[in-house]
Each structure stands twice: as structure tokens, then as C-alpha cells.
Amino acid sequence: MDIPALRERAETYFGGLAPTHDWHHVERVVENAETLAGRTDQTVDEDVLLGAAWLHDIGRKRESDGEIADHAEWGAAEARRILETQGVDPATVDAVAHCIRAHRFSNDVEPESREAKLLSDADNLDAIGAVGLARTFAYAGEHGRTLHDPALPPEVDDSPAGETSFNHVHKKLLRIRDRMYTDAGRALAADRHAFLETFVEQFEGEVAGER
């Protein structure tokens, strides 16, 4: 598998995307994946992991533009086509496609392979901690989402993703730590989760005029 060529090809799918899912997000996920792979004592097929990491969000722009419903499903199919043109063997193509299908937080596709679990963890790590908070509030700016509504605390917000940015932190970000699949992922997530908890405490204190 020609990873540098895949990287170049993948980048062509990201023109005009907003910061929450731009090319820099992909680069961070790749860095996370490499870190996690280096901290596991099990054998990892790095071609599968890195190929999937570079390609995992190639369907994002189409989904954002309303052309497709599920960027993970479309991206897996598109990745198959790309890899087949490289002459990659069918088993590896299948493995990469599974990683891409299973990486999405809201999908019901369970990651089965070690590489799929590592990619899922790598992607989820970019949704928590300082970067996760930055992306949450960038999304608020992109879509006009309310920062915080004191009349709608998280415990009475019925939206699965949270109606406000602060509620999104509670509804999604603070739950990601418990969705990690690997020991290495859980270790990194613990530190980022602690940062989120510190932020929530500080935010609530400032909103109440107590800090």
C-alpha cells in the first residue's frame, strides 16, 4: 500500500470544509493512531491503520453538502475504489473499509479488528480534551448554536447531542472516555476527560458569577 499516495489523494476530498472536520482533523487522527499503535503490545497492521486513518473522513464534504447521508459508509466504498486502483489485495481492502465504516461515533457498526478499534479511539480522542472543546465551539460558530442557556440545563435537555454547546459537552464529550476500545486509548482519554471536567466546573462557576 502506498501510504504517501493515499495521503495526497485523501487531501483532495477536503476543499472548503469547516474547521471541525477539515484536513487538520485528519492529520491529528493519524497522529493519534500512530501514538496508540506504538503503545500497544499487540501486532498492528500499520498499512491498514494508517490507510484507514488518512481516508476515514473522505466523505465528510459530501455529507456536509447534503449529497450523502452517511460519510462513513460512502467513504468506505470510495476507499475500496481507491485501494483497488492501487492494486491492494482484497483482504487489506476489506480491512480498511471495515475500519472506516466502524469509526463513526453515532454508527451502529462495531469495530471488530484491532486496527478498527485503534482508529475509533484515535478519532474519538480528537473529540475530547482541549481540541474537542475547540471543535465544539467552532461548530457552534459554524451553525449558530447557542453557547449556553441557563433555562436548559443538561439534565432536562432531551436532544441526544445537546441543544447548546455546553450541553453537547455533557451529552457527548463527557461520555467518550467510556467508549474507548483499547488500553492505550483509555489512558489518553483519561487525561483529556479530566481536562473536560475542569472546564465544566470553571464554566459553571463563571456562568453563576462565582468565579
Question: What are the functions of these language-model segments?
Answer:
Residues M1-E8, R211:
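Terminal disorder- and signal-encoded targeting elements
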Residues L17-L49, H71-P90:
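Alpha-helical phosphate/pyrophosphate-handling elements in metalloenzyme active cores
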Residues L17-W23, E31-Q42, L55, D108-R211:
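Divalent metal-dependent phosphate-bond-processing catalytic cores, especially two-metal-ion Mg2+/Mn2+ enzymes
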Residues W23-V30, E46, L50, V93-R101, ...:
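Short, well-structured alpha-helical segments
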Residues E46-D65, H71, G75, A79, ...:
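His-Asp-centered metal-binding catalytic motifs of divalent-metal-dependent phosphohydrolases/nucleases
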